[in-house]
Amino acid sequence: MAKSQDVRPVIKLRSTGGTGYTYVTRKNRRNDPDRMVVRKYDPVLRRHVDFREER
């Protein structure tokens, strides 16, 4: 069974472009304790935008 406070939890990255598009990834909680912001491609907008971690 998975621990409730896993070191590498699964997180959702939601587009800031307002399209609602999400990426699902894992992050290391020890190295990145704050919310992640990653610049990735949004296929709905057909451009790169910031994706923010959603909890």
Swiss-Prot record:
Which InterPro entries does the entry link to? Answer: Ribosomal_bL33 (IPR001705), Ribosomal_bL33_CS (IPR018264), Ribosomal_bL33_sf (IPR038584), Ribosomal_zn-bd (IPR011332)
GO CC annotation, single: cytosolic large ribosomal subunit
Q: What domain of life does the UniProt record list for this protein's source?
A: Bacteria
BP-aspect Gene Ontology terms: translation
UniProt xrefs under PROSITE patterns: RIBOSOMAL_L33
Establish whether keyword Flavoprotein is in the entry.
no
Q: Kindly list the GO molecular function terms attached to this UniProt entry.
A: structural constituent of ribosome
What keywords tag this UniProt record? Ribonucleoprotein, Ribosomal protein
Note the Pfam families from the entry: Ribosomal_L33
Fetch the HAMAP family from UniProt. Answer: Ribosomal_bL33
Please give the PANTHER family that the UniProt record associates with this protein. 54S RIBOSOMAL PROTEIN L39, MITOCHONDRIAL, LARGE RIBOSOMAL SUBUNIT PROTEIN BL33M
State the family it belongs to: Belongs to the bacterial ribosomal protein bL33 family.
The entry's protein name is: Large ribosomal subunit protein bL33B
Q: Which organism is it from?
A: Kineococcus radiotolerans (strain ATCC BAA-149 / DSM 14245 / SRS30216)
Its ancestry begins with: Bacteria, Bacillati, Actinomycetota, Actinomycetes, Kineosporiales
Underlying gene: rpmG2
